[in-house]
Amino acid sequence: MMRAEHTARALERNPVADTTTRPLRVAVIGAGPAGIYAADMLTKSEPVKSGELEVSIDLFDRYPTPFGLIRYGVAPDHPRIKGIITALRSILGRGDIRFFGNVEYGKDLMLADFGAHYDAVIFATGAVYDAPLNIPGIELEGVHGAAEFVAWYDGHPDFPRTWPLEAREVAVVGNGNVALDVARVLSKHADDMLVTEIPGNVYQGLKASPVTDVHIFGRRGPAQVKFTPLELRELAKSRDVDIVVYDEDFQYDEGSEQAMAENNQIKVMVKTLEKWRADDSPKTASRRLHLHFLQSPREVLGEDGKVVGLRMERTRLNGDGSVSGTGEYVDYPVQAVYHAVGYHGSRLPELPFDEARGVIPNAEGRVLAEDGTVLHGLYATGWIKRGPVGLIGATKSDALETVNHLLEDRPLLPPLSHPDPQSVNDVLEARGVEYTTWEGWLALDEYEQALGQSSHDAEGN
């Protein structure tokens, strides 16, 4: 972790008029939902609405496009979730937040640059990398992180256009929504995705997939899953895909009963799972999606450097919803393993970082130095602040907390030397950074939409 004095030195500034005579200059790094919500809440804060304060906000992203994981981390057959983009577009379309795409923090602009041009900086860079699954065999060909697969099927520019989809039987390790997304996309017939925004290369890859069986494994019981009811129910909507569950996986302890009594979402999901359990109709689909509970991964089995199986250990509930191993092992013959055990944030240059949690250390959004002192003017929001937990509602409340603290801290914010908004453009242009603006992105998006439509039309014929 970076020592406090190094970070403080990067923030040294020359005094200039305070924010009683000019707008408060704020940079938000990361143009996903967390960053956009934070910027939006600043513009709608009470000091701004009352006329006490003016704000000037610049939103930065290392990609030419805004929207972060909503654009590159949500399955293409989730139009309802991607509908959030409509709301985010309306925020940026107002014109009171400037967008700078294709600008990378730590490369194109350093911390000292932000310190010279902004009173405060909010980091909203998220958690986009796969948390590791530390078991033997994880290095074998055929083992993939779920985040990488999601990025591929969403057309992320950092990932190859092709993906290895030769496996007939596939394992997905994890019991959260990302695991369900991965399993659903792998098991779904490609032609049923043509009504979505699926990229053409992804459609072609999935179309050629020989998959027949996808297994989802969770180490705890049905009452401890981390899905949401909507995601779970969507599994049953896939054409020509049977849902398969197993009687021996349906165990409930006192903690399970308490969870079902106290949490309606859990009660609804258990009811859905029990309905599938009771369904004894013939399984005639050409593809099957198996849901396994109370099984923990112990080893990826391989031959000649490639995946040939996954060894799972049966677990038992301990009475409080936790589990322990039983010593009973089952080997599943699979040719690919996807691990979806969580996301992890990455270290940002010149900032402290908690490697274990994958977050910027902070106190309710105020960035902390190694010794626990507050680094005035630096803030965090979203998953880089709290870790990869919570949906859009949590992201909004999280952003509000950070913004409120930023506004409270105004008397403590260091002065800056270049308050003129145009000075940031001048720096980027002087360094040869080809940044995109909101207007430029709209033109790019319109072109991509037209290109995608013509591609879908051709594939559908």
Predicted regions and their residues:
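Beta1/beta-strand and adjacent pyrophosphate-binding region of the FAD-binding site
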Residues: 21-32, 166-173
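C-terminal, flexible cofactor-proximal segment of oxidoreductases
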Residues: 366, 371-461
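N-terminal Rossmann-like FAD-binding beta1-loop-alpha1 element of flavoenzymes
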Residues: 26-50, 180-186
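N-terminal Rossmann-like dinucleotide/flavin-binding domain of flavoprotein oxidoreductases
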Residues: 52, 56, 63-120, 266-286, ...
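Glycine-rich dinucleotide-binding loop and its adjacent helix/turn
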Residues: 130-208, 359-368
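Dinucleotide-binding/catalytic capping subdomain of oxidoreductase cores
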Residues: 46-59, 184-328, 406-414
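FAD-site-proximal beta/loop scaffold in flavoenzymes
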Residues: 142-160, 300, 306, 318-386
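Glycine-/small-residue-rich beta->alpha transition segments that form the dinucleotide
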Residues: 120, 124-131, 176-177, 334-347
